[in-house]
Amino acid sequence: MTLEERCHLLVHPLIDLSCRSLYSGGGLPVVELVGTGGIGRPRTSHIEAVDPLTVTDMMEQLQQGYMASVAATAGCTMELVSKDKWGVDAQLIRPPRTALDEETMVLAQLKCTTQTVPDPAKEFFSYQFTKRQYFDHLAKRRGYLKAILIVMTTSPRQREWTEATHSGLVTRRGCYWAYLEGMEVNPDVKKPTVRIPTKNLMDAAALTTILDRADRGESLNG
């Protein structure tokens, strides 16, 4: 089987095709997936770290702090999931207004990368999963509890991640979210690459909108 044959997948607007489209017989477009999967260099090899032995943990801590601040601003809590067994790192919870009401919750998979700088003038930027299972947990059909991907992009220079001024603490750079439920990728693709909309900047207003949609049983994409 050729590479082209093995890399056919169903088209979805958030799948990063990096490809040319091939149409046949009036059916769904067939696409050629380019450059997805395989073994790459370690993702921290290019980082100017304070301590290379801890930088991955520090990237996680940076994103957790960002999201905890966003959740607090939206009147929510962020509860970390201690065991990564089902592709979820955190729960974002809006408490009920009264004891008789229900809380609203979404699950979140947190990813932090230094390898891309989103351009707000462009519609998307790309993110590649390091394992197929991380994608599958987000793409599978779920019942009530929905799950989103939250990707943080930050500087490869660790000492530039934050800067304090008298007006506040600046965090570089930001988090973006994507709702991937229902996506389909060929089983042969081991490290799917997805498109993250640059309009989906994660802040308190975005989190509130996501939780409102979840509360109404709507698609989180609106």
Question: What does each model-found stretch correspond to?
Answer:
Residues 5-7, 14-86, 92-222:
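Mixed-charge (Asp/Glu-Lys/Arg
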